[in-house]
Amino acid sequence: MSEGTNTVVRDVTIVGSGVAGLSAAVYAARADLEPLVLEGPEPGGQLTLTTDVENYLGFPEGVGGMELIQRGKEQAERFGADFRHGTVEDAALEDRPFELELADGDVVRTRALIVATGASARWVGADGEDELMGYGVSTCATCDGAFHRGDDVLVIGGGDSAMEEALFLAKFADSVTVVHRRDELRASDIMAERARDHERISFRWNAELLEIHGSREEGVTGATLVSHPDGHPTEKLDASAAPRAANGIVEETVDVGGIFYGVGHVPNTEFLEGTGVELADSGHLETLEGMTTETAIEGVFGAGDVMDPDYRQAVTSAGTGSMAALDAEAWLESQSVRSGSRALVGPTAQS
């Protein structure tokens, strides 16, 4: 990977520019580490898909997701963080300084690495989801559920994530309909029982979301569902040239005010596979036990949703971002390899 490598060696490079990455950038920049932030394929991360954030400390009237991200970037830049468009495709972490190969072929060298690449919510591929994501279509009930007080809403999925979404939404919505493509849930028994026993939650079995209706001005106004007695109706829809009704497929349009995807998240850790960084079965970055963001490789730290399969909140991502920066600063001090006010010593000083 070293061919064509940039000779500059950064103290800290942060991969990802969501809340976790920005928080890490602010803290690292204030520590005079002059961090480089590689923004990734979706600058700003998942929060840019949220129109209103009402549960982030310090904004009693709420704040737009994009505005919160932009403010965070400006704050980090004010303290000296350097932002660059770029996506990491490969990482060499066996030697120091670490090397990160970008999609454009350039290579970034860094002494410490903070991975804040987030986790991308799975979408279902329904017509209209691209236009209406963030405008009534959501992947986070905790973030957006309160906006649907009094609405009828759909939850797509059949696992624990979907049950958690449905149970949270039932606090606000008049009705919650769980749409699942099979006739039994994949969720744990206890989560399935809680959802089944809730008076506001009902189920549409052997059904899938085909199309979402509405506009960015009005939000979601309805949805087209397809169902089949044997389940997985869209597969049969794609495979059959016959009329839908003749193939046993039933199509129905329902009026709803919101649609929530509960089909899981995929951590953005592909570039770490085979590097020695430990990944959970789910793909999430594994950190060491205890209150730390350190990983199995010294000098590599994790922050945000990429290492958090449970909370997935903007405020917790900001917290782990600051922790990662503080951990990275302490580690660099212990190695005496900061390129700022401290003299470089040790084998990496000549890198």
Regions found by a protein language model. Give the residues of each.
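A conserved FAD-binding loop/helix module that cradles the flavin
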Residues: M163-E165, I297, V306-S351
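A Rossmann-like FAD-binding core segment of flavoenzymes
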Residues: A76-D95, E99-L102, V107-T110, K171-E289, ...
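FAD-site-proximal beta/loop scaffold in flavoenzymes
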Residues: S2-E3, T7-V9, G125, E131-F147, ...
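Glycine/small-residue-rich loop that forms an oxyanion/phosphate-binding "nest" at active or ligand-binding sites
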Residues: F83-A103, V107-C143
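Residue-level detector of alpha-helix initiation sites
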Residues: G18-V19, E42, A119-A121, D160-S161, ...
